[in-house]
Amino acid sequence: MKTFASFCIAIVCIAIMIPSQTKAQQTSQDYTIELARLFSQDLFESNGVLFMEPVVKMINATSNSRFFSSAYIPKKVDKPYYRIGVQSMLGFVTDDLRSFTPVMPSKEYDFNDLGEFIGFNILTGEITRLDTAKLIHYIFLNMMHDGVHGKNKGLIQTPNSASTAMGTGDTKFILPHESLDSLFKAHPLYNFPQMPQFLKDTINSAIYQFPTEFTLYGGNDLSAIFAAVPQIEIGSLYGTELLIRLIPPVDLGETVGKFAFWGLGLKHSISQYLHDNHSTLANFDEPVNPYDIAVQVVYQGTSLKNTVGITKADLEANATIYNANLHGSYNLGGGFEAYTGVGFEQITINSTYKYFLPVEIQWQLGLLEQGKSEPTPGYPGDQNPQSTDLTFTDTNIKWTIGMTAKFGNIRTILDYSLSKFNVLSFGLVYEL
């Protein structure tokens, strides 16, 4: 479904900030670049799930709509029947889904942590082991904790609100060099007797050259989400129907990429055990009893591959979606039925991203010439592609109420679902 594709494209806006470690070099500039990568990763890990959480809820609720209408399923038929149609869903974005409170990555200083980065000879006081890049990163997170939560609270300001993938407007984390300098000098290691001057100078230089702005990119300013999917229902065998949804792998262009969607479901009649005349019916045209009850389970999957953005981020994403519901319908006569149902649904999205540092960070680090998005002489750009795996999950309880009307071989369906993400659904089905 296109909603899943929109989710994956939206997350790249923030995911391209994620860095990875590179081999430590001997210049402060290289340490600054490495710190920028690590801190960008921290920002994403602290805020990425909050940024995308409303979209995951939306996909879960929308993808798990328009499975059922009439609960009537004949126990046996003279020959198989088919319902072929298009099911469309319109979801509404509420204000609480458009923003979240961003988090500044930080870590409180603990002397016991230092053994991970640095080792000393107790007798001589000499350094025997040193991971400079990781030590700088650790100290930097200590500084963020001090500036946001510690004794120097206020030197680093965290934005009060940021846009989710459904909201709008970028949010910037501002890291003034003056504040960073004060926080480094206030760090316990700054005056630690065994801290060599060369290491202190290296850390100070790396921090001084550090970018002053990191951006959490805004969303797509969505007030509603629309999706449609072809659906086939085949029945019946022992009061059971088969549901099939399918969009074969197709290239939807530069914006979406290569996308595929499929689903399989089984619906079983409970009414056949309640109505004596249910087993004798040899057609599916219209229920003969006032009410019917059925239970249904559906499993769906999606996949997406795309290359997006100036930095050519490669995206691969797959989702598995489950739904189980109990629903009933009431025969009003004349081809009209009212129905309602309650369902439990779950989604898991596994994504892999391969990308480079954002262009604006590369400008601040001197990797790219200001205003240019491609390497030029003396400005090689980010040469180290990074890869990150992310997993998103959501569960939902949904109540649906609707009406279906049959006109000859054409059936129209309209319903509304209430849950964490409300959905209005419409179906148009041809029966044969």
Regions found by a protein language model. Name each.
Residues T280-F284, N289-N331, E345-I349:
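Outer-membrane beta-barrel translocator/channel fold
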Residues D78-P80, S223-A228, G257-L264, N289, ...:
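Residues that define the transmembrane beta-barrel architecture of outer-membrane proteins
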Residues I73, I84, P230-S236, L264-I270, ...:
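Residues on the lipid-exposed face of transmembrane beta-strands in outer-membrane beta-barrel proteins
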Residues Y339-L432:
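Outer membrane beta-barrel transmembrane domains
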Residues V93, G239-L242, Y273-H278, G335-A338, ...:
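Repeated loop/turn-to-beta-strand initiation elements of outer-membrane beta-barrel proteins
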Residues Y72-P80, D95, E254, Q272-I293, ...:
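Short loop/turn motifs that connect adjacent beta-strands in outer-membrane beta-barrel proteins
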Residues S88-F92, L246-V250, I270, V297-S303, ...:
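Transmembrane beta-strands of outer-membrane beta-barrel pores
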Residues Q25-P230, G235, L264, G301-K312, ...:
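A subset of solvent-exposed loop/turn segments in beta-rich extracellular surface proteins, enriched
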